[in-house]
Structure formats: C-alpha cells, structure tokens
Amino acid sequence: MLSNKISRLLIIVNLLSENREGLSKTDIMKAVEKKFALQNEPFDYKDLAFKRDIKDVRIDLGLEVIYDRKHDCYRLCSLEVDDSRVELLLNSFKVFTALIQHSGLPEHIIPEKRKSNGLEHFSTISEAIGLKKYLEFQYFKYDINQIEIKKIKPFALKESKNRWYVIGCYENKTDLRAFGLDRISNLSTLGQHYKTKINIATINKYYEDSFAMFTNEKVENVKIRYDLRDGNYVKSYPIHHSQVCELNDEKTGYNVSLKIQITLDFIMELMSRAWSVEVIEPLHLKEYLAKIFEDAQVRNT
C-alpha cells in the first residue's frame, strides 16, 4: 500500500519540509526506498518515476518543488514551507502511515469520541469550489435554534479549532460568510456557475488578524499574563500567529502580547484558562472579562 503514488508524493514533501536547505535526487530516492523497506515493501525507485513524482507534487498536491542547479538539490518553494496546507497533508499522512502498519485500527490508538464533524460534506464542497458552482443546504443556527436554507458561492474550506468551515458569500453579495460543516444538512451542488474576484489571498487576509471565525472587529494590542503551567501550554500552542510569549523576570509565569481582533471566540479562549489569565491591556477587555466572571458567580451561588 505504501508504494502507491500519493504515498511517494507525501514522503517527498515530508522530506523537503524537514530539510529546508534542500536534498539531492539521490538522497530523496534513497530515503523513499528506505521508507518502503521499513514497511516490508521493497521498492526500486527509478529515475523516470522520480521525475514524474516531482512534477505530480505540483499537479496533485498544488505544491511547487524547485530544482536548485547551483547546489544540485530540490527544495519546496519558500512561500509554501510554512503553508498550513503542507502541515495538514503531512499530519494526516503520519497518522495514515502509522495505521497501515497494522491490520486494522490497533487498540493502542484511541481516537476522540465526538459527534460527526461534517467531513462527509468535504469532498462535495471541495468539488463545487473547483467547478465554481453554487451550493444549497440546510443550516442550523445556534443562536435562534432554527434551520435556514442557504444558497452560497463557495470559495474555500477553512479549519479552525478542530472544526471545518466553508467560506463563501450569498448570491449578489461580496461579504464573506463562514458555515460550519457540522451544522450543514441536505447539501446539494447546483448546476448554476458563479464568477468572483475573491481569491485565497483575499480570504487569508480577511482572517489574518482574527482568532477562529469571528471577524469585523478592529485590531488591538493585547497584553495578558499566565502562570507558569498555562503559559507553557500557550507557548507550545500559540493563540495567534502574532503572539509573543516571554518568561517573566521572576520565572513564575509568562507575559503574552498579541495583535488581534477582540472577538467572542478570542474572549472564550481567554476564559478557557480563567484560573490563571490576567488581562493587562486594553482596559475594556479587562472590564468585559471581569463582568462575565461576576455574572457567572451570581449564577453559580
């Protein structure tokens, strides 16, 4: 199973992402053959197959592998090394390769027991995005506890906090909307095509300063403190790409700075470590959190 094409492509991407300075053709081919051998699947990697695989990394995975003639090596395009798509591909592949070493799901791998996350819609939505076709579906609104019919132009699939969303806009509208896949039902692709000037760069820019999926707030400088334990968690798994996390002078906690939109999702993230978090600035955020905690105390006494 490991010797199929998609596995070879992902092995190459993994090798190049771990060796950003680049690898020679010989090094890549030997590493691929070694990977197969470890899985008891001997594979004789031919030069022609290698050349085809390098080309197919771009065609099938949308990633550019550059040949550096001066140093006689191959590298991932520098613009894509930190791409979250690469991380998604490789993380999925690492789980996959661990699983195929066993006949079926081994007992020592324990997945989280949670309800469906809507991934059954993933391929349908992805195909509609590629074909630029409208989608129509029923959507459950949490705030009003009702189902509404939605018709959208789908532009992208975006992951946030272990949930997937389809990003798009309504017909004759240009403002971006996000719809959780886990709240979608009766999904159908319509025959109607759409045109748009919105691209992935536009969408990435739209969410650049936000945490999770809420947007449309102004960007502010936020300073917070955590104790040592929570600070280490936040340091290892940053809240936002703008995060700067520094150990305080006493080495008893962390000072964290962010440049971010203060949205409901961000506030909920701060509340998830309520026993430790201390907001330094802005003052309105400090007061807002204090009010939430005061109201919670009233409800729970």
What positions do the PLM features span?
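General beta-strand recognition
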Residues: 73-75, 136, 165-167, 255, ...
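Well-ordered beta-strand positions
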Residues: 66, 158-159, 246-248
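Short, hydrophobic/amphipathic alpha-helical patches that form generic packing surfaces
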Residues: 7-15, 92-95, 269-272
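Core beta-strand-centered patch of the WYL/Sm-like small regulatory domain
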Residues: 4, 109-223
